[in-house]
């Protein structure tokens, strides 16, 4: 899909599935430093082996923040000057993301709302999946604004 305007006819449809993205321990550690959240379940592999998770896991907010990257890997809109996050609804962290696992996102378009000629507001039902795991890591309603080039 090359145009943000093409989305208007796709409301209610799954519009894209991202490629897989690795959630490495390095990525988790970098996120921990950025947000100053050093809880051992995220950054201490030795101690985390004895946890209910059997190893370190990604922060829930790291998984949530990956939506931006996963969407960039999925969509390329030639008529978009820029996009901004507008908000989130109904976010749930439904399964832990183990260090070293791979995730991808499925994007279903829930709403498409024009912004008075300057762009559109879209609401995605986003589901982040973990490779080889039936239960999703995250489900969220993600609202973004996209401004025309």
Which residue stretches match the model-derived regions?
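Hydrophobic (often cysteine-bearing) scaffold residues that line and stabilize catalytic clefts
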Residues: 59, 63
């Amino acid at each position: 899909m090359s145009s943000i305007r093409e989305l208007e006819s796709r409301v209610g449809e799954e519009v894209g599935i991202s490629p897989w993205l690795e959630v490495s321990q390095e990525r988790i550690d970098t996120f921990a430093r950025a947000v100053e959240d050093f809880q051992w379940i995220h950054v201490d592999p030795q101690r985390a082996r004895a946890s209910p998770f059997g190893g370190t896991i990604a922060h829930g907010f790291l998984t949530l923040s990956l939506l931006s990257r996963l969407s960039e890997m999925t969509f390329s809109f030639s008529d978009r000057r820029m996009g901004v996050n507008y908000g989130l609804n109904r976010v749930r962290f439904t399964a832990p993301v183990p260090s070293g696992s791979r995730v991808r996102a499925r994007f279903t378009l829930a709403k498409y709302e024009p912004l008075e000629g300057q762009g559109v507001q879209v609401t995605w039902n986003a589901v982040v999946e973990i490779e080889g795991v039936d239960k999703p890591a995250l489900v969220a309603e993600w609202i973004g604004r996209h401004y025309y080039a």
